[in-house]
């Protein structure tokens, strides 16, 4: 499988989320370092069993018909393996893959240039496809359905459009915000796959595989401790595994025990539930300063010294999903689970996690 990457302007800059150890967004050179951990065939991809079965059937049918498969949309939270699956599809089909992203395509002409250079059967992977400019989206509609692009020749009133026929290819789009895709674009995808957060047992298997690739000797219970702290996200699991590997190297450990995992990740202020310093600060402020809530977002953000957007988009989704926090019309409320996690006896009227 040949891979061509054109990310261009896809770097959105450092922010609070990208600096956290438990961020589901890539940090630093992680996209490159993740390459050694990526499986190359669908059978080696751990987790998402229903999706894998659907995708295997989809690819097998395309191979038997001897035609490029329909376009594929991979939707789900960041860090779950959308890029890896795109690479696997191209590898299974034994065709090259061209890689770009929504932010990298600044003009429709950028996308037209990529499309016009594709060969028959080639895969075009567009990460963050929901961030394509509107003009590029409209060009992509036609290319995906009719396999042609209209090239503008000349300028001003004398300009004319010349249709350029394209070879049959497959677009794989990845998005963390499927709802932001316009309906005409969604309709062009013949197969849509939704990736879910990983349960602890599947994440544990993934960590054991990654540890074997990285040469980390995990003792009994160590992979489980890592899985518990990884927020159901393979990208986070692999990142934490690397930090534990650093710990093992520095301390000359032959085997990494579960206590070593706890001690190593405590250094980064990551607790047994995968909560970090900022998560704990948010819960602590609600419980101690606002008696469990409700508290408005702006007041809460001011109390922890962060922007309101950071609290709302970086901290709250995981806290709500894991039952530590409830959003109400009156504000944020800490659940009984949050109180007990902080080691504080909850009030009698405190909400239980849903």
UniProtKB/Swiss-Prot annotation:
Positions bound to ATP: 37-38, 79, 82-84, 145-147, 188, 198, 235
Name of protein: Holliday junction branch migration complex subunit RuvB
Alphabetized CDD domains for the sequence: AAA (cd00009)
Oligomer status and interactors: Homohexamer. Forms an RuvA(8)-RuvB(12)-Holliday junction (HJ) complex. HJ DNA is sandwiched between 2 RuvA tetramers; dsDNA enters through RuvA and exits via RuvB. An RuvB hexamer assembles on each DNA strand where it exits the tetramer. Each RuvB hexamer is contacted by two RuvA subunits (via domain III) on 2 adjacent RuvB subunits; this complex drives branch migration. In the full resolvosome a probable DNA-RuvA(4)-RuvB(12)-RuvC(2) complex forms which resolves the HJ.
Binding of Mg(2+), residues: 83
Subcellular location per the Swiss-Prot or TrEMBL entry: Cytoplasm
Family that this chain belongs to: Belongs to the RuvB family.
Gene3D superfamilies in the cross-refs: 1.10.8.60, P-loop containing nucleotide triphosphate hydrolases (3.40.50.300), Winged helix-like DNA-binding domain superfamily/Winged helix DNA-binding domain (1.10.10.10)
Positions bound to DNA: 327, 332
The organism of origin for this protein: Bifidobacterium longum subsp. infantis (strain ATCC 15697 / DSM 20088 / JCM 1222 / NCTC 11817 / S12)
Annotated gene: ruvB
Compositional bias per record (Polar residues), positions renumbered to this chain: 1-27
